[in-house]
């Protein structure tokens, strides 16, 4: 009798990706985040779909429609807060996933890595547009400030910003198009994620040692399916604790005030997961310079395979690189804290030093440390 899961064209793809996939026997929980990101994406698409059924993308009614969802729609409050905090969980998983890739040298799979960087950009764009939709004060002013950054592009900047706005300021046209893009982007992300997996399955997964695991593979199911289910349960537990106990912990109180173009909030800041990039942007006094630093702070990930000077792929056996990696993590946490602080002494200088440190660590110190470690191997 033929096994349908190995013969049916569709089932065969699923089987080869999630059941009979040969996986390294030693991958740790740091390899759980890929599946967790998939769960986050599905959760966001589903909650987003139900929110879209009740939301109106019009400047006069957007804020009221979100209030209506929370007060009058059956379980609307939990759907709204799962969506808002689901974005936070999404970015926590994203940062962990990228951090894992940096630590264990997963960027050696260049196609997979580059698609991942595109996915990161797409997710950030989606989250930004989603933050504009409730049309609170921070939504409006966040949209104004961030889109305005494009005016720093020489010659075409101003025209580009007005084209994106659909007018001379952030208004009804902007909100409508942001809603349209925010709806379509997660499906583009899902398609890109499939390409990401396609490229990953061409090479197979990396593992903590960074050594080829071809000699010791185990089937994905049941070993890693059960491991992923544990990860998923912990993710959902963390999300539901956040949603049910402190749903507004990561939000901004200003967003409970309807958007008012005549009243600027004292401190305009994005959601917490963009604060590190926002701090880098603010640390440069020049507008164009700040925008370039902002883009490069993420785009620098593309250079990781080129900056890898070590003879070993993983950092598992490289203590100096490990030390620098954790300094980089601490630096990013510092930038996140600074991004949420007002622009005044001593925060300005701390932000500037942390920004310099960020680029210095990635572009200079880590490649140099790798070279030193290579020479230490000869001892």
Curated annotation (Swiss-Prot):
<dbReference type="GO" id="GO:0046872">
    <property type="term" value="F:metal ion binding"/>
</dbReference>
<comment type="similarity">
    <text>Belongs to the cytochrome b family.</text>
</comment>
<dbReference type="InterPro" id="IPR048260">
    <property type="entry name" value="Cytochrome_b_C_euk/bac"/>
</dbReference>
<keyword id="KW-0472">Membrane</keyword>
<dbReference type="InterPro" id="IPR027387">
    <property type="entry name" value="Cytb/b6-like_sf"/>
</dbReference>
<feature type="transmembrane region" description="Helical">
    <location>
        <begin position="178"/>
        <end position="198"/>
    </location>
</feature>
<protein>
    <recommendedName>
        <fullName>Cytochrome b</fullName>
    </recommendedName>
</protein>
<keyword id="KW-0349">Heme</keyword>
<dbReference type="InterPro" id="IPR036150">
    <property type="entry name" value="Cyt_b/b6_C_sf"/>
</dbReference>
<dbReference type="Pfam" id="PF00033">
    <property type="entry name" value="Cytochrome_B"/>
</dbReference>
<keyword id="KW-0679">Respiratory chain</keyword>
<keyword id="KW-0813">Transport</keyword>
<dbReference type="GO" id="GO:0008121">
    <property type="term" value="F:ubiquinol-cytochrome-c reductase activity"/>
</dbReference>
<keyword id="KW-0496">Mitochondrion</keyword>
<feature type="transmembrane region" description="Helical">
    <location>
        <begin position="226"/>
        <end position="246"/>
    </location>
</feature>
<feature type="binding site" description="axial binding residue">
    <location>
        <position position="83"/>
    </location>
    <ligand>
        <name>heme b b562</name>
    </ligand>
</feature>
<dbReference type="InterPro" id="IPR048259">
    <property type="entry name" value="Cytochrome_b_N_euk/bac"/>
</dbReference>
<feature type="binding site" description="axial binding residue">
    <location>
        <position position="182"/>
    </location>
    <ligand>
        <name>heme b b562</name>
    </ligand>
</feature>
<feature type="transmembrane region" description="Helical">
    <location>
        <begin position="347"/>
        <end position="367"/>
    </location>
</feature>
<feature type="binding site" description="axial binding residue">
    <location>
        <position position="196"/>
    </location>
    <ligand>
        <name>heme b b566</name>
    </ligand>
</feature>
<keyword id="KW-1133">Transmembrane helix</keyword>
<dbReference type="InterPro" id="IPR016174">
    <property type="entry name" value="Di-haem_cyt_TM"/>
</dbReference>
<keyword id="KW-0408">Iron</keyword>
<comment type="subunit">
    <text>The cytochrome bc1 complex contains 11 subunits: 3 respiratory subunits (MT-CYB, CYC1 and UQCRFS1), 2 core proteins (UQCRC1 and UQCRC2) and 6 low-molecular weight proteins (UQCRH/QCR6, UQCRB/QCR7, UQCRQ/QCR8, UQCR10/QCR9, UQCR11/QCR10 and a cleavage product of UQCRFS1). This cytochrome bc1 complex then forms a dimer.</text>
</comment>
<keyword id="KW-0830">Ubiquinone</keyword>
<dbReference type="InterPro" id="IPR005798">
    <property type="entry name" value="Cyt_b/b6_C"/>
</dbReference>
<dbReference type="InterPro" id="IPR005797">
    <property type="entry name" value="Cyt_b/b6_N"/>
</dbReference>
<feature type="transmembrane region" description="Helical">
    <location>
        <begin position="33"/>
        <end position="53"/>
    </location>
</feature>
<keyword id="KW-0999">Mitochondrion inner membrane</keyword>
<comment type="function">
    <text>Component of the ubiquinol-cytochrome c reductase complex (complex III or cytochrome b-c1 complex) that is part of the mitochondrial respiratory chain. The b-c1 complex mediates electron transfer from ubiquinol to cytochrome c. Contributes to the generation of a proton gradient across the mitochondrial membrane that is then used for ATP synthesis.</text>
</comment>
<keyword id="KW-0249">Electron transport</keyword>
<feature type="binding site">
    <location>
        <position position="201"/>
    </location>
    <ligand>
        <name>a ubiquinone</name>
    </ligand>
</feature>
<feature type="transmembrane region" description="Helical">
    <location>
        <begin position="77"/>
        <end position="98"/>
    </location>
</feature>
<dbReference type="InterPro" id="IPR030689">
    <property type="entry name" value="Cytochrome_b"/>
</dbReference>
<dbReference type="GO" id="GO:0045275">
    <property type="term" value="C:respiratory chain complex III"/>
</dbReference>
<dbReference type="GO" id="GO:0005743">
    <property type="term" value="C:mitochondrial inner membrane"/>
</dbReference>
<keyword id="KW-0479">Metal-binding</keyword>
<feature type="binding site" description="axial binding residue">
    <location>
        <position position="97"/>
    </location>
    <ligand>
        <name>heme b b566</name>
    </ligand>
</feature>
<feature type="transmembrane region" description="Helical">
    <location>
        <begin position="113"/>
        <end position="133"/>
    </location>
</feature>
<dbReference type="GO" id="GO:0006122">
    <property type="term" value="P:mitochondrial electron transport, ubiquinol to cytochrome c"/>
</dbReference>
<feature type="transmembrane region" description="Helical">
    <location>
        <begin position="320"/>
        <end position="340"/>
    </location>
</feature>
<feature type="transmembrane region" description="Helical">
    <location>
        <begin position="288"/>
        <end position="308"/>
    </location>
</feature>
